[in-house]
Amino acid sequence: MVCLKTLSVFLAAFAAADARAVFKTQGHKNSEMIPDNYIVVMKDGVSQDDFKAHISSVSSIHSTNKAKRGTNTEGMKREFDIMNWRGYHGHFDRDTLEEILNDSKVDYVEQDQVVRISGLVTQRSAPSWGLGRVSHRQAGSRDYVFDDSAGRGVTIYGVDTGIDINHQDFRGRARWGTNTADRDNADRHGHGTHTASTFAGTAYGIAKNANIVAVKVLGSDGSGSTSGIIAGINYCVQDAQQRGILGKAAMNLSLGGGFSQANNDAVTRAQNAGIFVAVAAGNDNKDARNYSPASAPAVCTVASSTINDSKSSFSNWGPVVDIYAPGSDIIAARPGGGSTTMSGTSMASPHVAGMGAYMIGMGANPRQVCDRLKQLATAAIRNPGFSTTNRLLYNGSGQ
């Protein structure tokens, strides 16, 4: 295991070397680092051939160092290529890490960290109020008023704990995508099914006609890794590109961890590629600037509101928050059938992901959707937090 303090001293000795890559330390004191696991990001302009040559070289160096020192490091684990933003994740010893940092083609390296869902489960039955709230300027209505196109022709990627794609709320519109978390292609937690139901469920969802793709990046305990999240995002962009739906797609990330430049860069590339990205602000009642992917400027960062148009007590806040959406006591689907109630910025984010798909289905450009949602939003949130918007999601129904 590499101690970050020792590593900082170790790296400082090479600070004068212009070619040396930057080792980024995450900026959140509560970040849970994964020992000896690193995310390596290549410089812009590195060709596919040079990237492959670098991968081959690192694999060879790792094998040599492992044989020489008898370490138990696993080496290269996965590669990323999100619209020519290239990198990889690996389990490396200190000497291999030194060689990576000395390669002039490497932009930066950061240590992998644990990422968790941003939702809190509640086991009581409560009526869903979010749909009515986002389609009316005033609080109190239980009617959801919406254009009947409802996201038709748009695909939403649920990057989460998996999705029960056979749940009756999806009516055949959901399919399995990929799994970067484990070997169990099922939602054993329930979080991912709930968020998917919120963004595109027939009964509980915003974009009732959108297609749904399950991208499992978190396990049954609701946790995963930054590298696994990036691998999931990588899949979404490549899948959308292969299917010709860039410009007709959205992505929901109801998850987060400490600040990660690599995580932020990955979601930014996805957004710039033509996928509208909604992310949860986080549930620690703290400034969301210290969290990723919430702190990525290009995405739509969502805080949570209550039925009374107040900031949810748990919701993160701050200048990176783009909009509020219903997140307390939200009812939606659960794996195996039926429904359950959950609270969190995890529940707020899919309201915005679904609304993004709704807008895209009516002709909006994914790159402009967040700005459009902020223009439409209602100035309704009381005590939103220091330097935080008070704008609440609204679909422009005229009600």
Swiss-Prot record:
Species for this entry: Trichophyton rubrum (Athlete's foot fungus)
One Pfam family per UniProt: Peptidase_S8
Keywords: Glycoprotein, Hydrolase, Protease, Secreted, Serine protease, Signal, Virulence, Zymogen
GO molecular function terms listed in the Swiss-Prot or TrEMBL record: serine-type endopeptidase activity
Main location: secreted
CDD domains named among the record's database cross-references: Peptidases_S8_PCSK9_ProteinaseK_like
Family: Belongs to the peptidase S8 family.
Residue ranges of every copy of the Inhibitor I9 domain listed in the record: 38-117
Purpose: Secreted subtilisin-like serine protease with keratinolytic activity that contributes to pathogenicity.
Glycosylation sites: 102, 252, 308, 395
Domain Peptidase S8: 128-399
Propeptide: 20-118
Subcellular localization, as worded in the UniProt entry: Secreted
A GO CC term assigned to this protein in UniProt: extracellular region
Source organism, top-level taxon: Eukaryota
Gene that this polypeptide is encoded by: SUB4
Record has Transferase as a keyword: no
EC top class named in words: hydrolase
Catalytic residue positions: 160 (charge relay system), 191 (charge relay system), 346 (charge relay system)
GO biological process: proteolysis
Name of the featured protein: Subtilisin-like protease 4
Induction, as annotated: Expression is strongly increased during growth on protein-rich medium. Expression levels are the same whether keratin is present or not in the protein-rich medium.
EC numbers for this chain: 3.4.21.-
Residues making up the signal peptide according to the UniProt record: 1-19
InterPro entries linked: PCSK9_ProteinaseK-like, Peptidase_S8/S53_dom, Peptidase_S8/S53_dom_sf, Peptidase_S8_Ser-AS, Peptidase_S8_subtilisin-like, Peptidase_S8_subtilisin-rel, S8pro/Inhibitor_I9, S8pro/Inhibitor_I9_sf
